[in-house]
Amino acid sequence: MLDPNILRNELGAVAEKLARRGYTLDVDTLRKQEERRKVLQVETETLQAERNSRSKAIGAAKARGEDIDPLRQEVNQLGEKLDTAKAELEKLQAEIRDLALSIPNIPDDSVPVGKDENDNLEVSRWGEPGKYDFEIQDHVSLGELTNGLDFAAAVKLTGSRFVVMKGQIARLHRALAQFMLNLHTEQHGYLETYVPYLVNHETLYGTGQLPKFGEDLFHTKPLEEEAESHYALIPTAEVPITNLVRGDILDENELPLKMTAHTPCFRSEAGSYGRDTRGLIRMHQFDKVELVQIVHPDESMDALEALTGHAEKVLQLLNLPYRKVLLCTGDMGFSACKTYDLEVWLPAQNTYREISSCSNMWDFQARRMQARFRGKEDKKTQLLHTLNGSGLAVGRTLVAVMENYQQADGRIEIPEVLRPYMGGLEYIG
């Protein structure tokens, strides 16, 4: 959520910056709402002052033995007018808030201007794609050869975009998640957390999934139904972890907070019909190890570089070729002000595919959550800055390992760093 003060005082500049990401800010509506809000605010305060004055006059008149009925009638009339003005002001403020909640974050000035993924900027590459003297197979075929991936069984149980993993492939999937968690907690200083997989609406508003992206979620009840027990499955552990500081005021010396969690993630993929229908790339349910940092505003851009480096380290230790991409304004997520994507090399597709997205949200989520800290010198409260990234998507990492480590006979070599998690096993198949 953007700062209401800049929406009031710098509306033109905000509209120009949001236009870089392809968002058209409804300037006329915002201006009209703000003008009407000011009028109603003054009217409400004036009526309140008049009613208070008349109420005091009743006491004085009563002490003098005067007839107070006319004053009482006047106070009652002022009260009715005040109630009407307050109700209109509250309704307008709710409309202003609803509109504000639908406005995306302002891109950082360092973000390249562009329309879509074709305008993203490649920052660096690590590792060289392997050369194979045999016909490359994709992870689906390799999963069939090793009897480790069963999509037909998942269709029977649930439907498309699900999978049943078996045997050593299931074990490899588990090993990847354990390896990632150990790396981030033991070497990168993150606190491991276990969080609910169901969250309430307030939590989803806090990180920006609601109100705009409700159709991307799996809900326990129809979204239109208002209910206290209305939950949604988490689309990412970013949602519950970041909301751990919702409504809190931290001490500055508690910062930064660095947390990680391994969870399943659930997404409806509402806008992805026909895309990546084969294999594990785009699933309704997938596992991810999430990285979240809650930091001082002065540190957030440095924290983004560090967090992205933590995700990169996973790929480097697995010896998987990848590239780092700075997303353009038109390809960034709703809540982000700057995002790096890490894209891993998939031999069967002969291209790089996203395996991690690391973002600085600035104070956008913190304002929605009212998450603040108290300065150690001036004791004033400020909004925190929040960051998150995949460290990594476990299913896509499994795909990358299977395809990059495949052998001519269909076996899959286990990366050295994963062998301790696999009982010393060197090959699958």
UniProtKB/Swiss-Prot annotation:
Q: Which residues are ATP-binding? A: R267, S268, E269, E354, I355, S356, S357
> Where along this sequence does the record place binding of L-serine?
T236, A237, E238, E290, S390
Q: What Gene3D superfamilies does this protein map onto?
A: Bira Bifunctional Protein, Domain 2, Serine-tRNA synthetase, tRNA binding domain
Which pathway does this chain act in?
A: Aminoacyl-tRNA biosynthesis; selenocysteinyl-tRNA(Sec) biosynthesis; L-seryl-tRNA(Sec) from L-serine and tRNA(Sec): step 1/1
Record GO biological process: selenocysteine biosynthetic process; seryl-tRNA aminoacylation
What is one cellular component GO term in this UniProt entry? cytoplasm
Q: What does this protein do?
A: Catalyzes the attachment of serine to tRNA(Ser). Is also able to aminoacylate tRNA(Sec) with serine, to form the misacylated tRNA L-seryl-tRNA(Sec), which will be further converted into selenocysteinyl-tRNA(Sec).
Tell what the record comments on domains.
Answer: Consists of two distinct domains, a catalytic core and a N-terminal extension that is involved in tRNA binding.
Concerning its family, UniProt says: Belongs to the class-II aminoacyl-tRNA synthetase family. Type-1 seryl-tRNA synthetase subfamily.
Protein name listed in UniProt: Serine--tRNA ligase
Q: Which gene encodes it?
A: serS
